[in-house]
Amino acid sequence: MEWEPVIGLEVHVQLRTQSKIFSGAATAYGAEPNTQACAIDLGLPGVLPVLNKEAVKLAVCFGLSVNASIPPYSIFARKNYFYPDLPKGYQISQYNFPIVQNGHLDIENEDGTTKRIGITRAHLEEDAGKSFHEGMQGYSGIDFNRAGTPLLEIVSEPDIRSAQEAVAYLKALHSLVRYIGVSDANMQEGAFRCDVNISLRPKSEEKFGTRAEIKNVNSFRFVERAILFEINRQKEILENGGTIVQETRLYDAVQDETRSMRTKEEAHDYRYFPDPDLLPVEIGPEFIEAVKNQLPELPWEKRKRFAASYQLSNYDVKLLTTQIEIANYFETVLKIDKTIPPKLAANWINGDLAAALNKNNLSITQSPINAEQLAGLLHRIADNTLSGSMGKQVFETMWGGEGDADTIIERHGLKQITDTEALEKIIDEVIENNPTQVEQYRSGKDKLIAFFVGQVMKATKGKANPQQVNELFKKKL
């Protein structure tokens, strides 16, 4: 029997606010344990939560960017469960009246086709603290710095049918929340975490199978591997006549497997009820319009503009716009020097710069070569001061911190030879020294032109303009 996976994702996005969702405590990552937790975060008696307006604004911003509806009011509820890092014994979340409802996000599959993934809802909630077990013998520690940090939980429809589609959706979502400034979405810091709900059903059936949930998967690669493992696990059980247990599972990256954690809770297990300490949030049309007017250019809008304005291929556009920082870097280069061809800038940013960043595990914001410096280098390539190979030489020297392109060109004598008279003298020598090859070329062996150009490049130590040399040879021969 052929089985079809049915996958839905719940993504927890940490909102980019200076303070927590219900208190004034800071949200900075990496502070000493328990130095950013106040009485409200710790659930101490005699204190009341106060909603952070910026968190509401960011949630609405996300909702508008995925064409969702923003209801006129939203209610916070208490989600009751016990866990050591949940100091109040409940989490303030949303249940029946979430702040974002019924949106969608389009993804591009590997074959270039587009698929629309529905977004059921996105709701605001507070994060829990963090338990520590390593380095502590016989006991565990709890850091409450994260408790109360604002989260937006984004719940997709079960529209995803493969591990590849799941990763494409997550990457599109990750890119979007960074573009609109809702979150830094730093996965290493836990600011973008994913729960995967997955079930199998016979290919021809509409009814869903029993689902398992895989909790807190924090990388695109692990999401893909966890889904592939879970599909095979469920398939093996079903084909051997067994039944799938509705449960919560954990993904073990070392063993590359999912393991049972606990039976899956239903909503009634959490005994949701409206939080009596928080009034319903009223969201008027004026507020929504104000947020809408502040929305930046969205990823798909930027892709269309890049393709139209800069005449770039889909491949180049996709690489340049995946991250907002790369797109900004590219446009900064072109604004600094309008003589630089967009294709030249795209080739260098997607090629040499991207390779150097990957090799050194750096983001583009950490690049030793800023946009102004790269613009200086590309200007010298565009005006034929440097050949492409010489440009690579200068790039490597710039990466090492030896100054801008002009300084390096002057210091190392790397200026390209473009003087026609000087080049013709060298060409005449090459022709004179290679009579056999000249005769063969004139007999129709056109590919020998590369040999002649190579001889000139060798004589000039790579400083000649190969295109110019090519044209001069053709005229001479």
UniProtKB/Swiss-Prot annotation:
Coiled coil: none annotated. This is Aspartyl/glutamyl-tRNA(Asn/Gln) amidotransferase subunit B. The keyword Ligase applies. Its EC number is 6.3.5.-. Allows the formation of correctly charged Asn-tRNA(Asn) or Gln-tRNA(Gln) through the transamidation of misacylated Asp-tRNA(Asn) or Glu-tRNA(Gln) in organisms which lack either or both of asparaginyl-tRNA or glutaminyl-tRNA synthetases. The reaction takes place in the presence of glutamine and ATP through an activated phospho-Asp-tRNA(Asn) or phospho-Glu-tRNA(Gln). Keywords: ATP-binding, Ligase, Nucleotide-binding, Protein biosynthesis. It catalyses: L-glutamyl-tRNA(Gln) + L-glutamine + ATP + H2O = L-glutaminyl-tRNA(Gln) + L-glutamate + ADP + phosphate + H(+); L-aspartyl-tRNA(Asn) + L-glutamine + ATP + H2O = L-asparaginyl-tRNA(Asn) + L-glutamate + ADP + phosphate + 2 H(+). NCBIfam families: gatB, PRK05477.1-2, PRK05477.1-4, PRK05477.1-5. One of its GO terms (biological process) is glutaminyl-tRNAGln biosynthesis via transamidation. Heterotrimer of A, B and C subunits. One of its GO terms (molecular function) is ATP binding. Belongs to the GatB/GatE family. GatB subfamily.
